[in-house]
Design a protein with these regions (language model features):
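Conserved RecA-like helicase motor-core motifs
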Residues: 81-91
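Generic hydrophobic/packing signal
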Residues: 21-28, 43, 86-87, 124, ...
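Conserved helicase C-terminal RecA-like lobe
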Residues: 56, 70-82, 95, 102-232
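Helicase P-loop NTPase motor core
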Residues: 1-83, 106-110, 166
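Proline- and acidic/polar-enriched loop/turn elements at helix boundaries
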Residues: 62, 88-89, 152, 208
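Short, surface-exposed, polar/charged, turn-prone segments marking secondary-structure boundaries
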Residues: 10-16, 89-91, 112-115, 222-224
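Positions that flank functional sites
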Residues: 65, 91-92
Length: 232
């Protein structure tokens, strides 16, 4: 494997040296019953070793196979108040696809959330362009009302859009209102599934067959898994 990795021009050079059997710490192997338990065991081990050996948190590293797996460790670390830094990527909740899904949740909980509104109104693309969004922002500022209020009452506030754009705006409004209505009878996991499917987020991600697209898909699936754990 190392002979192939060496062909990578961007690879960081390293020398792999085998150790003698009588040197180094033995490897502990454990089997966890769930990813949540795995995260807790790893973090508890860090706390134990830090206490025994008078170490600092920056003396420890957690290696995982895929980016999506970082969530469970990040949550376990946060629960115990342990600071951490992600190397070679972003923290799970800072990844674009995760922030996109969470923005839909934020808008469902609070339709007047302007940051969430701007992030979701045309993502995935639904034909509501920057010009229209800028008009909504201007009308909102001039009338002292939220962006959502303008979207729901475009003619009352004199928003100048054509019939096609109006129909697309109303389609978005109806989508969000349906999620809001579902909030009464469905839990976060069920609403999360609805959001990624009906908004078109998962469909867009699945159309990207690159390694990055696969990673984004795995991240979204891991987010939904976390919601399921929360609701269980």
């Amino acid at each position: 494997a190392n002979s192939l990795i060496e062909k990578n021009r961007q690879q960081i050079p390293k020398k792999v040296v085998s150790a003698k059997e009588d040197k180094g710490e033995p490897i502990d192997v454990f089997e966890a019953y769930s990813d949540v338990e795995e995260g807790e065991i790893v973090v508890n081990k860090i706390i134990e070793l830090r206490r025994k050996n008078d170490c600092e948190y920056n003396d420890f590293a957690i290696l995982y196979r895929t980016n999506a797996q970082s969530r469970i460790f990040e949550e376990a670390l946060r629960k115990r108040g342990i600071p951490y830094k992600i190397y070679g990527g972003l923290s799970f909740y800072q990844r674009k696809e995760i922030k996109d899904v969470i923005s839909y949740f934020r808008l469902v909980v609070n339709p007047d959330d302007e940051e969430a509104f701007k992030r979701t109104i045309n993502y995935p693309t639904r034909g509501i362009g920057k010009t229209t969004i800028d008009k909504i922002i201007d009308v909102s500022a001039n009338n002292g009302v939220s962006l959502w209020t303008v979207l729901c009452n475009p003619f009352i506030y004199g928003l100048d859009v054509n019939k096609g754009t109006y129909a697309k705006m109303q389609g978005f409004r109806e989508l969000i209102e349906s999620f809001i209505a579902d909030d009464i009878n469905k839990n976060a996991y069920e609403i999360g599934l609805d959001i990624i499917r009906r908004s078109g987020i998962m469909n867009e991600v699945c159309q990207d067959n690159s390694s990055e697209g696969l990673s984004r898909k795995e991240n979204i699936e891991e987010l939904v898994n976390g919601m399921n754990d929360f609701c269980a």
